[in-house]
């Protein structure tokens, strides 16, 4: 089996970056409503945290296996964890899979797909703060801070929908905490990809993180008693979302500046809102004036940060 050579200049082409990043955002945006649909197909209640964690673990173990297969086809050989990257895989597994999705799955079960998709967009702002003030990987300018404030205003506004001035810690609060974990994982993935295969890192961290989540969910009493063909297909789709999107995003980050790729992140809430409105029938909230203004503010904030 021959290795598929990835040309750095080809990966840096505007059309390739545009199409690749848009595909990632479309897949990630579809995850918001599809996870909620998956809960219904597997008969997982919104209060059944243990079953939600078990469901997440199963998804990511499968996603990791798919990513390793994908990476092996690209390399023309079976990809194994490279020497000296065990601790790096562990760090990514804890941040990108265990901590991020522990909060994400719990939060999504207690809020709407529309709200979740917009709040998740804040990870762009958090990543800039983390990379600038903690890891000193880039300068945090006044323009970037302005973008952060504009985007945060959008998050605050969406939580005022219907004159509701309160945020649920188990809902919107959990989704926000998941974005913080994702921001840290993005910084580490960019750093580690300089020396290691990003697809290999994504695949094995998914497997490790998925096993941890599965074990935790099972130990907490989580069980998935309702099995159907539709439920299995949805689980496979969600696994493909993670395997394809994270692997492709990691490759784009490897060959391009973070800002050039991150600017496309504004499409995550756009796709999330549209698909949630369509698949979850949240049209009243998704198409309401408050949600639309909130979405515009978040997208404007990301644009200001990256222009």
Features from the language model and the residues they span:
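Hydrophobic transmembrane alpha-helices of multi-pass small-molecule transport proteins
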Residues: 67, 129-130, 141-160, 213, ...
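Helix-helix packing/entry segments at the starts of transmembrane helices
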Residues: 58, 97, 101, 115-122, ...
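Transmembrane alpha-helices of multi-pass small-molecule transport proteins
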Residues: 41-96, 126-130, 181-185, 202-220, ...
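Hydrophobic/small/kink-forming positions within alpha-helical transmembrane segments
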Residues: 29, 33, 61, 93-98, ...
């Amino acid at each position: 089996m021959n290795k598929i050579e990835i040309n750095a200049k080809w990966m840096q082409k505007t059309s390739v970056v545009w199409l690749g990043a848009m595909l990632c955002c479309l897949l990630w945006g579809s995850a918001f409503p599809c996870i909620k649909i998956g809960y219904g197909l597997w008969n997982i209640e919104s209060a059944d945290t243990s079953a939600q964690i078990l469901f997440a673990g199963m998804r990511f173990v499968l996603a990791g296996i798919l990513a390793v297969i994908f990476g092996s086809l690209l390399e023309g050989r079976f990809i194994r964890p490279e020497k000296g990257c065990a601790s790096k895989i562990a760090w990514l597994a804890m941040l990108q899979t265990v901590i991020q999705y522990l909060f994400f799955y719990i939060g999504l079960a207690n809020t709407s797909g529309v709200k979740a998709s917009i709040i998740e967009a804040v990870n762009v702002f958090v990543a800039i703060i983390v990379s600038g003030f903690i890891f000193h990987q880039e300068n945090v300018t006044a323009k970037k801070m302005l973008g952060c404030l504009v985007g945060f205003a959008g998050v605050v506004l969406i939580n005022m929908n219907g004159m509701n001035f309160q945020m649920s810690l188990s809902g919107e609060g959990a989704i926000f905490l998941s974005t913080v974990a994702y921001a840290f994982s993005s910084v580490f993935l960019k750093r580690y990809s300089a020396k290691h295969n990003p697809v290999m890192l994504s695949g094995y961290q998914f497997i490790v993180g998925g096993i941890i989540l599965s074990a935790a969910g099972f130990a907490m009493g989580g069980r998935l008693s309702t099995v159907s063909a539709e439920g299995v297909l949805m689980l496979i789709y969600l696994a493909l979302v993670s395997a394809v999107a994270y692997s492709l995003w990691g490759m784009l980050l490897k060959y391009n500046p973070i800002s050039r790729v991150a600017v496309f992140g504004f499409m995550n809430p756009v796709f999330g809102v549209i698909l949630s409105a369509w698949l979850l029938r949240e049209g009243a909230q998704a198409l309401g004036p408050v949600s639309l203004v909130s979405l515009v503010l978040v997208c404007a904030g990301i644009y200001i940060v990256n222009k």
